[in-house]
């Protein structure tokens, strides 16, 4: 991984790695980069009947650090966006188990992926 990769490209690569990781671990990716006027969800996936909004955080170093950038305000927004996604897809939030996870992807010294299940 070169050091001149743009922040956008790094984020896109991190999301690709996160999707692959989730798929290998039994998740079905339902949507990526879902956007509405209020914001964006990186990944929406399903496993064992649970709909999961996954926030992907990428960085060059230390897989624990990027996760620290998810604030209480961001968690509230992710919850709102997940409910908006459910509404758009005609799914009833009261009949489905929901969860918010985070996946941290770092590249230096080597690729490291950490999945934080149920951050909210």
Curated annotation (Swiss-Prot):
It comes from the Bacteria. InterPro entries: Restrct_endonuc-II-like, tRNA_endonuc-like_dom_sf, UPF0102_YraN-like. One of its GO terms (molecular function) is nucleic acid binding. Pfam families: UPF0102. Belongs to the UPF0102 family. This is UPF0102 protein TW312.
